[in-house]
Amino acid sequence: MRYTIRPLDTATWAAFAELAERNNGVFGGCWCMACHPEVSRTDAAQNRAGKERRVRGGRAHAALVFDDSGTAQGWCQYGSPEELPGIKHKREYDKDPPPPPDWRITCFFVDKKHRGQGIARAALEGALDQIAHLGGGLVEAISEVTAGREAQGRFLFSATVELFEQNGFTRARQVGKHAWIMSRVIEPT
C-alpha cells in the first residue's frame, strides 16, 4: 500500500484528532503529549486541548501517515529538545549526555488495525524528510532493541532500534536494558 505523508498542522489537525479519538486518545489519553512539558498524567481532555493549542500555535511537529482513502493511520512525533524535554530513561541519559541534538524523535503511533503494514517506517521517513526541509541537523531518538526477544507493542511507542538502523541511525549509548540512544545527522534540503 502507498501512503501519503503530511505534517501535523492546522490543516491536518482534524485527521490527527480522529485517529487519536479512534484509539482512546492514544495509550489511554496521552494524545502524544507525554514528552511535552505540560502533559497531564490523569486528564485526557487536558492533553487533547494542550496538543491542539500546540498544533494551532505551530509548536508541535509530526509526520502523519494517510492511507489511500485519506484517513490518518499513524504518525511520528519530532521536535526540538525544548519542545520535547521529556524523554525515556532520562536519569541514565543525563549521566553522560550525548552532544545536544537539534531534533528529537519521541513518539510513534499506528492504529491498532493497521500495525505491521509499514506505517511506522513511512512515518519515520516522513519525519526525516520534514526535518531536512526545516534545516536538518543532529537527530536523536531513544528506542528499543527487539531482535532476539518478544517485545510488547505498548512499549514500542518509540519504535525499534532496528527500524532506526535501517534508516541510517547509529547506536550512541545504551540507557536501559533494551533501550539505546540513536543518532543521525540529516542534511538540509
Please place each PLM-identified region on the residue numbering.
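Conserved N-terminal entry element of GNAT/NAT acetyltransferase domains
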Residues: 1-35
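Conserved beta-hairpin
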Residues: 16, 60-76
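Aromatic- and Gly/Pro-rich amphipathic surface segment
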Residues: 25-57
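A short helix-loop-beta-strand connector motif used in the catalytic cores of GNAT acetyltransferases and
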Residues: 46-64, 81-86, 104
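Conserved acyl-donor/pantetheine-binding loop and adjacent beta-alpha core of acyl/acetyltransferases
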Residues: 71-107, 115, 151-158, 165
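Conserved acetyl-CoA-binding loop-helix of GNAT-fold acetyltransferases
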Residues: 105-110, 116-133
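Conserved GNAT acetyl-CoA-binding A-motif
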Residues: 124, 131-153
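C-terminal "cap" of GNAT-fold acetyltransferases
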Residues: 154-161, 165-167, 172-189
